[in-house]
């Protein structure tokens, strides 16, 4: 447990020393420190890097080559300033410090209390590394950090502010931090050799609680690393502003976050802290000026953590495929193609972050790491096999390979191979049927080319490159040719053909004599116009034209028989109405039948049509009143308009039908029967047979017939 509080998530703190470090220190740290765990394990990376990593792994036991997976997954973030903070310990005894332009924006770490109280700021930084506890608001010590970044006088950090969030922590973690605080106070100043000689995992992580504690703080450098390597790929408009240092081109672009941080400090050791903040945070904020540097470090941490949570669920399940398909791109960027340097680093850092989230649990992280390596190997094998299969299909002469139609190509290759083999083997019915089934399946799939079928059938037509429209057009032309050769049509159009058929039909109709046997004319299929033209006879009377219907027609014969049947039924069906009401109505009818206006007599059946409205007793009074009104009004209308020969309106309608006034007794009798039929139709089953009113009804019927014949 000899490591100091330099594992804080604020990993961008520079040294307190005003003297910049030499380049050899960075070269020594650069060669193995900040490359991801997967990159060191990757068998596809260049040999020079593997040899370099193995050389450092042999010379320095704190970096095992393949040994301890837990320590390696934690230790691959070695850009965090642990060696620099060993040099910082000399300056930690100053409670206040001035502004020095040489140390850049690394002065955020040095403003705290002297060494005996530094366990408390370390706990605060660890709290900021948890994303679920830092989502709302940022602590006031971040504003102090912001003030020191501007170059102002940093206020002294109070112990009350440091203990403000301690209520959220567990008691076992506080107790463990006190133990660490005592161990930290014993080591006054440690050099870089203290870090390099320690290699035992038990001494570094004595308990699971230690690993949980350091595991969450170790997420911070990787998250910022991932955020810095992802943002330039999403914002390409300020990508040209960031020019990569030449040393970075020589190494690799798989882990650009800490690398950029180190080169920024190495190349500009004498610039002011404001300038360094703007240069160093250009990955995250493209237009950060001196006035815009008041973003606190805590807010930066929270933003990075929120971005990490947002993108880890989207891109986490895909990181294995991205690692497989981007190893070649990583090698290209190593050769010097720095056109898009951040895309490979983005994907690899996403993969590393995803793997480190699995390493939170100490017991299950080793198995998950091995499963991840195995899946990556399988994915690379699948990509290699698919590329090899694509190369094999490109060698075949009849197949046009494209990455979209890989399934179709494999089917085509299968058919072609079977076809070539089929020439050397004995043909059997089973093999030919199987071949035909494969060909039909190939046609059933909606592919552009039908050439497997045509090759099997040895067709001379080359329909491989013909689109579907031309194929259909060829079929249509073949059909027309067959029709012209084998099914010749007569030299007549359809209009002429059907017009001649109509003329023949009309000639057959006209040949029938009009006055022949009546049996011939009893046709039900006669048209109405034909019936009217043949059987209508003009009969001139004083008022109207009457159409006399031919009695030989079968339809009118049926109607006449129906009326006779209804007349016979009318003798036995009577309404529920009382005899007194019927006598009153009959007396009023006898008055009406003697009324004459200019030689015109009102039809006697007019009043009887009102009997169909007498269905229930409450309507009887209404019908009698309306009867009187109706009997007088039509004659007034007739008297007023007799010179204009206008028929009375009311007298022309019986049950919705327009019927003219007739003087013929036969016509009036038929109309009377029709009115009686309508009246009985509305009464329906309410009528009943009575012997009491039967004689009276027959007597009244005689009177009606006498009146009709007397006219």
Swiss-Prot record:
Residues 1-42, 48-67, 94-350, 371-404 are annotated as: Disordered. GO terms for cellular component: mediator complex; mitochondrion. Coiled coil: none annotated. It comes from the Eukaryota. Keywords: Isopeptide bond, Mitochondrion, Phosphoprotein, Ubl conjugation. Residues 1-15 have a biased composition (Basic residues). GO terms for molecular function: DNA binding; transcription coregulator activity. There is a cross-link at residue 400 (Glycyl lysine isopeptide (Lys-Gly) (interchain with G-Cter in SUMO2)). One of its GO terms (biological process) is positive regulation of transcription by RNA polymerase II. Its main location: mitochondrion. Residues 48-57, 163-197, 204-213, 220-242, 296-311, 318-349, 371-383 have a biased composition (Basic and acidic residues). The keyword Phosphoprotein applies. InterPro entries: THRAP3_BCLAF1 (IPR029199). This is BCLAF1 and THRAP3 family member 3. It comes from Homo sapiens. The gene is BCLAF3.
